[in-house]
Amino acid sequence: MKAHYGGQALIEGVLIRGRAGAFATVRGPDGRLVHREEAIPAGRRGPLNKIPVLRGVLALGDTLSMGSRMLMFSADVAAGGTGESMSTTSRRAALGAGAVGATVFAILPNLIAGRLRRRKPQDPPKGGIGQSLLEGGVRIGILIGYLGAISRIGEVQRLFAYHGAEHKSISALEAEVPLTPESVQVFDTAHPRCGTAFLLQSMITSTAVYGFIGSRSPFGRLATRVALIPLVAGISFEVLQFNARHLDSGIVQALNTPGMWLQRLTTRQPTDEQVEVAIDALQGAMAMDQRA
């Protein structure tokens, strides 16, 4: 069975997304498993979600929104709460923080690249392909440095272990093996449809897109970087969707290799208890699909 489930790591838990919605499982301080499910409204599965590129923008918005809510839920449960105390303000703040982070990540490489090029007056004018390539290198360098730095934090290492458990459980399902900790643990912590690969693909896409839109004005470059974030996300989504449908292709496997390597920074080997949480979340998402 080729089931296309995805998900993300939560604080002491895992979120799995299916066709009908998302199911989160979080282990509380007392060891009990706390669940939360969120169905995808029928309107979000309408005709707009079939339009290439646009569907990627909509999917990214849903992913960020739902992921933020579930992350807040997991934080509350992990702290000993019930997961029901999230306020609308807290949810909006989490989503806003993600939007601000994406904007800063689009702008900062441009500023750094501009500073580097000003030190080399023999270079061609700012903007265009040269500027975009330099930005792309800076952007990827920032990402790798950031992931490498936070991966040394103990709490983040646990989060990354749940990330690995999520990948292992989905790989086991796709391989049609029993969903038990023993069977799941034999799989790799990396997965070709991982969100980490989406980040890397977005950076590659942004380098290509920004390369065709040159501007001598620093403000113009910054404005276009922010304005084109949805387009970059939509194109990146389509590329990953294509790759997911052609995983048996040697070319696609080669293209996926950098993303698989990058996951060595964002995943860790999980314990059996962490794998149990991932399996529970996956089974919950499967049950939602069966009821839909």
Spans of features found by a protein language model:
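Residue-level detector of alpha-helix boundaries and kinks
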Residues: 49, 53, 97, 141, ...
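Multi-pass alpha-helical transmembrane bundle typical of ion/small-solute transporters
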Residues: 47, 60, 64-89, 118-122, ...
